[in-house]
Swiss-Prot record:
Gene Ontology biological process terms in this record: photosynthesis
Protein name (record): Ferredoxin--NADP reductase, root isozyme, chloroplastic
Transit peptide feature range: 1-62
Cofactor(s) recorded in Swiss-Prot or TrEMBL: FAD
Residues covered by region (Disordered): 1-27
Main EC class the enzyme belongs to: oxidoreductase
Main location: plastid
A single Gene Ontology CC term: chloroplast
Binding site for NADP(+): 156, 176, 237, 269-270, 299-300, 309, 337-338, 376
Domain FAD-binding FR-type: from-to ranges: 93-221
Protein source organism: Oryza sativa subsp. japonica (Rice)
Length: 378
């Protein structure tokens, strides 16, 4: 990605990040109140009926509470023809001006923060592959560099290369609004809120947005073997690239890629209201029970075996025998989300390896060498 890369680990910002605002005082806002789970809309808010894609009624995300019984045809298929992913088509000095299609809150009233699903129309001019990121330049002046624009913020893309409209013209982002609360007073300090996340979450259909990229190669979905196993571990908005993977595997009719392997998603969030794209993932369980597994770690609602809070590393430990066997068989494993999740996960994997009489350091080295290990944290 666009930041540091070391030992096959890319440290960058998945969807929902706002760089420079990662202090313990930052919390997601919860300033919209809903009485129940009817808080999601029924369709994506396209700018006009005249521009509404013909497949828009088949879009499946948290904004559409439905399941598609059959895969959706995509176009244009020449998006499959490139041998290498597009990289940095648009740079910060010459960004592409795209248009906001819709902004929808996708968490419930009890979620500790606000997360939005944002659809951007790039007109097919900024193509990307699953697992890549877009850079967003919010409007206004950089307070640290008078006269200069704000720095680019990276967001993992939450859609396939065809977008939620299946026509290759849109990109979806999953963005958590970053709000700063003074740790002493508990009051919000708007001057320290995340500039880019608030710009995106406050945007309206038709608003313009400056886009750079796409960037990143570490999280690209390996497609050489359509029967491979993919283990995906996410916290919060880190689920963004995995939504793209799963839509490509299970929702889209792509002649070049017929997935017949196993996709296993572990998603860690605070509570049920914080689950992202849950109905979409649940629909895959019903349609593809032999090819998809889905486990949730709800830290404020579930307990681990020691009666503590349930985190993704607890789920990994619970299924450790299966996970290690799958890794030994060549499975890919992906991590995306807050960087704070990695130490606990690494400790768990090391403990499990030792219980199996293995050296975790050697195993990790081999996984990286085999390009089975993919990490994107912020």
């Amino acid at each position: 990605m666009a930041t540091a890369v070391a030992s096959q680990v890319a440290v960058s910002a998945p969807a929902g990040s706002d760089r420079g605002l990662r202090s313990s005082g930052i919390q997601g806002s919860n300033n919209i109140s809903f009485s129940n789970k009817s808080w999601v809309g029924t369709t994506l808010a396209w700018e006009s009926k005249a521009t509404r894609p013909r497949h828009a009624n088949k879009v499946l995300c948290m904004s559409v509470q439905q399941a598609s019984e059959s895969k959706v045809a995509v176009k244009p298929l020449d998006l499959e023809s490139a041998n290498e992913p597009p990289l940095n088509t648009y740079k910060p000095k010459e960004p592409y001006t795209a248009t906001i299609v819709s902004v929808e809150r996708i968490v419930g009233p009890k979620a500790p923060g606000e997360t939005c699903h944002i659809v951007i129309d790039h007109g097919g001019n900024v193509p990307y592959w699953e697992g890549q990121s877009y850079g967003i330049i919010p409007p206004g002046e950089n307070p640290k560099k008078p006269g200069a624009p704000h720095n680019v913020r990276l967001y993992s893309i939450a859609s396939t290369r065809y977008g939620d409209s299946f026509d290759g013209r849109t990109t979806s982002l999953c963005v958590r609004r970053a709000v700063y609360y003074d740790p002493e007073t508990g009051k919000e300090d708007p001057s320290k809120n995340g500039v880019c996340s608030n710009f995106l979450c406050n945007s309206k259909p038709g608003d313009k947005v400056k886009v750079t990229g796409p960037s990143g190669k570490i999280m690209l979905l390996p497609e050489e073997d359509p029967n491979a196993t993919h283990i995906m571990i996410a916290t919060g908005t880190g689920v963004a690239p995995f939504r793209g993977y799963l839509r490509r595997m299970f929702m889209e009719d792509v002649p070049k890629y017929r997935f017949g392997g196993l996709a296993w998603l572990f998603l860690g969030v605070a509570n049920t209201d914080s689950l992202l794209y849950d109905e979409e993932f649940t629909s895959y369980l019903k349609q593809y029970p032999d090819n998809f597994r889905y486990d949730k770690a709800l830290s404020r609602e579930q307990k681990n075996k020691n009666a503590g809070k349930m985190y993704v590393q607890d789920k990994i430990e619970e299924y450790s025998d299966e996970i290690f066997k799958l890794l030994d068989g060549g499975a890919h494993i992906y991590f995306c989300g807050l960087k704070g999740m990695m130490p606990g996960i690494q400790d768990t994997l090391k403990k499990v390896a030792e219980q199996r009489g293995e050296s975790w350091e050697q195993k990790l080295s081999q996984l990286k060498k085999n390009k089975q290990w993919h990490v994107e944290v912020y």
